[in-house]
Amino acid sequence: MPAAAAAGPPYKLVTVNTAPERAARLIGRVVEDMKDRYTIVHAANVAAIEEVEAVVREQQPDLLFTASMWTPEEAQKIVAIAKGVLPVGHGLKTFSLPQGLQVERGPDAVVEHIEEHLPSLLA
């Protein structure tokens, strides 16, 4: 069976990151590393909290990741906005990176952290 067939249905991902190039690069690494288990399509990045509602409404993502530059309170606000836009029962899965992870431990730590938590998030 080809790897793509084993990966299951695609998950549409929206990231919320003020550095869109970095988001694309790091998520690209996760997508590549996990492609035998999951099909993840990075549909969009949102660079500002004020843009979350419009992008989530347009993209209707399955996954929403908030980056480590957001405080826990900001990440909660982003998640609440996203869930408030989607229809009841949509089943949006969210993941917030710990604040400061990128700055303190670098991009490899971000990729590792996502890859460690993705299986339980998608279970």
Q: Where are these predicted regions, by residue range?
A:
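A short, well-structured beta->alpha microelement
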Residues: R37-R57
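Short glycine-rich or small-residue beta-strand-to-loop segments that form or flank ligand, phosphate
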Residues: K12-V14, D62-S68, P98
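Mid-chain, well-packed structural core segment of small domains
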Residues: V56, Q60-L92
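Short, charged N-terminal beta->alpha structural module
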Residues: G8-I40
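Short acidic, S/G/P-rich loop/turn micro-motifs used as interaction or catalytic elements
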Residues: A19-A23, M69-E73, Q102
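Eukaryotic N-terminal targeting leaders
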Residues: M1-Y11, S120-A123
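Conserved strand-to-helix beginnings and helix N-cap segments that scaffold or border functional pockets
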Residues: A24-I27, A75-Q76, P107-D108
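Ser/Thr/Gly-rich flexible loops in soluble cytosolic domains mediating phosphotransfer, phosphorylation
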Residues: G84-A123
